[in-house]
Swiss-Prot record:
The gene is E1. Residues 137-300 are annotated as: DNA-binding region. Its EC number is 5.6.2.4. ATP binds at G426, P427, P428, N429, T430, G431, K432, S433. This is Replication protein E1. InterPro entries: Helicase_SF3_DNA-vir (IPR014015), P-loop_NTPase (IPR027417), PPV_DNA_helicase_E1_C (IPR001177), PPV_DNA_helicase_E1_N (IPR014000), PPV_E1_DBD (IPR046832), PPV_E1_DBD_sf (IPR046935), Rep_E1_papillomaV (IPR016393), Znf_lg_T-Ag_D1_dom_sf (IPR037102). It comes from Canine oral papillomavirus (strain Y62). ATP-dependent DNA 3'-5' helicase required for initiation of viral DNA replication. It forms a complex with the viral E2 protein. The E1-E2 complex binds to the replication origin which contains binding sites for both proteins. During the initial step, a dimer of E1 interacts with a dimer of protein E2 leading to a complex that binds the viral origin of replication with high specificity. Then, a second dimer of E1 displaces the E2 dimer in an ATP-dependent manner to form the E1 tetramer. It comes from the Viruses. One of its GO terms (molecular function) is DNA binding. Phosphorylated. Sumoylated. Residues 119-141, 574-597 are annotated as: Disordered.
Length: 597
């Protein structure tokens, strides 16, 4: 039988395996393990609990540091740094200086907000820190004037304070004056942080400068409505307020009120009856007209053209621009003028008024004789410096015999045929034009000019006056007169072509002509010699050292001349009324109830 594989376990000791272990000493085993550990240095003999505690503390420190960095970056976005705050307090202009361009970063919408988990734990601390930044410390609150000086936009600060105090915006009551030198008689002023003593004193001091003023105070703001005696600009008004209330310019707002706003007028009217409001003087007209019933009913009056024509006729106004300007200036006192300004057809009304006034004046002039017309002009002339001797002295200075001039002048005024034209000729600078122009100005005559001879209507002004003047007639002008105007110089009826009208037939008014041409010595104009009276002016017109004329020829001088030689000129006596009173002037409007009584 073959032998079995493997060890032979039949023996007691099992072959080479020891059944029992030999005992050894413990110290020798420990030394062997220590020597093996020191040599290899591969095993950490530290306790597991101690190692876990150190790693947890390190992790917490790292998380706290990271959280503080994120919080600091977040604060930089929303909290102004102390350095920039100090810089802005020193000078607001430095805040606008930047080396890098400023771009506004738009915050994008975030669907999922990231949360570190630390913000919730520090929420209480952050809220307390924010409260400490906003709330001022007790006992260190600044007054309103100091806060105004430190704020960047002072005007916006005053606007906000005014609206919070009075419940209405300052710009709702005023209209803007961009220039500080534009004058106005009405001003709305807001004063900030005025002392009570100065405010009470201002109620008395403002009476010397204003015909009406309104003063109301709410908190630190004082509202003023000033209607000054003399219009002032904003700079002058600020200077006045500084002297009265002892405040600076930054504590004041001033703009003129909205005078055409019914809401603003009603605000001032109702505010005048409120408690704590002080007013002085009569209510301004622009407030009364928009609030009081009597003024409101008067403003509803319709425009009456006849009243405007009557006013222009009484003031002897015929120019359209002059009528429009002067009548508009009466809107504050005249109800019809106010209705004229509210009308949408002002140019048409002005044109119609000027046309009707010219028609009435022309008809009145034609109705009067030359004697009556001269008498009317003498009455209308003011009693100023003027003497008839000035006219006589000037004629004698030119070597003209006064008796002969008076005889020809008498026939000239009467319009006698062949004596209807006076010609003053001579060298230049002898006073020919001055003499004739002064007489024409007194009698309100008309001027014709040969420069318009190419037009068919250049003689049309002769239909509008009692006397005409052709100044500085040259040789071509005399040729034209010799060819076409002989019958006009005779004083007979001739035809004048008028614009937009049929040719008009009229008697030529007395005509004055000044010229440098000697018509008497030229045989070519021999047919004009018998139709004109000629006066030669050989002497140069005298002037004093200051360049003033040596003879005062004005309206007063001619009025005195006609009064002095009224009988010598065979002028008829002025026609009076039945009872010796002068005739009543033209009346274009119906009489009122009080006037008829």
């Amino acid at each position: 039988m073959a032998a079995r594989k493997g060890t032979d376990s039949e023996t007691e000791d099992g072959g080479w395996v020891l059944i029992e272990a030999d005992c050894s000493e413990v110290d020798s085993a420990d030394e062997t393990s220590e020597n093996a550990s020191n040599v290899s240095d591969l095993v950490d003999n530290a306790s597991i609990a101690e190692t876990q505690g150190l790693s947890l503390q390190l992790f917490q420190q790292q998380e706290l540091t990271e959280c503080e960095e994120q919080l600091q970056q977040l604060k930089r976005k929303f909290v102004q740094s102390p350095q920039s705050r100090d810089l802005c307090s020193l000078s607001p202009q430095l805040a606008s200086i930047s080396l890098t361009p400023r771009t506004s970063k738009k915050v994008k919408k975030q669907l999922f907000a990231t949360d570190s988990g630390i913000q919730s734990s520090n929420e209480a601390d952050d809220s307390l820190e924010g409260q400490r930044q906003v709330e001022p410390l007790p006992g260190r609150e600044e007054n309103g004037a100091d806060a105004l000086f430190k704020v960047r936009d002072k005007r916006a600060f005053l606007y906000s304070k005014f609206k919070s105090s009075f419940g209405i915006s300052f710009t709702d009551l005023t209209r803007v004056y961009n220039s500080d030198k534009t004058c106005s008689s009405d001003w709305v002023v807001c004063l900030y942080h005025v002392s009570d003593d100065r405010r009470e004193a201002g109620k008395t001091l403002l009476q010397d400068h204003c015909e009406y003023f309104f003063l109301h105070s709410m908190g630190f703001c004082t509202l003023l409505l000033l209607c000054l005696f003399v219009p002032k600009c904003r700079n002058t008004l600020f200077k006045l307020c500084r002297s009265l209330f002892h405040i600076s310019n930054v504590q004041m707002l001033a703009d003129p009120p909205k005078t055409r706003s019914p809401a603003v007028a009603l605000y001032w009217y109702k505010k005048g009856f409120a408690s704590g409001t002080f007013t002085h003087g009569e209510l301004p007209s622009w407030i009364a007209q928009q609030t009081l019933i009597t003024h409101h009913l008067a403003a509803e009056k319709t425009f009456d053209l006849s009243e405007m024509v009557q006013w222009a006729y009484d003031n002897d106004l015929k120019d359209e621009s002059e009528i429009a300007y002067k009548y508009a200036a009466l809107a504050e006192t005249d109800e019809n003028a106010l209705a004229f300004l509210k009308s949408n057809n002002q140019p048409k009304h002005v044109k119609d008024c000027a046309t009707m006034c010219r028609y009435y004046k022309k008809a009145e002039m034609k109705r009067l004789s030359m004697s009556q017309w001269i008498d009317e002009r003498c009455k209308a002339t003011d009693d100023g410096p003027g003497d008839w001797k000035e006219v006589v002295k000037f004629l004698r200075h030119q070597g003209i015999e006064f008796i002969l001039f008076l005889a020809d002048f008498k026939r000239f005024l009467r319009g006698r045929p062949k004596k209807n034209c006076l010609v003053f000729w001579g060298p230049p600078n002898t006073g020919k034009s001055m003499f004739c122009m002064s007489l024409l100005s007194f009698l309100h005559g008309v001027v014709i000019s040969y420069v318009n001879s190419k037009s068919h209507f250049w003689l049309q002004p002769l239909t509008e006056g009692k006397m005409g003047l052709l100044d500085d007639a040259t040789r071509p002008c005399w040729l034209y007169i010799d060819t076409y105007l002989r019958n006009a110089l005779d004083g007979n009826t001739f035809s004048v072509d008028c614009k937009h009208k049929a040719p008009l037939q009229l008697k030529c008014p007395p005509l004055l002509i000044t010229t440098n041409v000697n018509v008497c010595g030229d045989e070519k104009f021999k047919y004009l010699r018998s139709r004109c009276s000629f006066f030669h002016f050989p002497q140069e017109f005298p002037l004093d050292d200051n360049g003033n004329p040596g003879f005062q020829l004005n309206d007063q001088s001619w009025a005195s001349f006609f009064k002095r030689f009224w009988k010598h000129l065979d002028l008829s006596d002025p026609e009076d009324g039945e009872d010796g009173e002068t005739q009543r002037g033209l009346r274009l409007t119906a009489r009122g109830t009080t006037e008829s009584v």
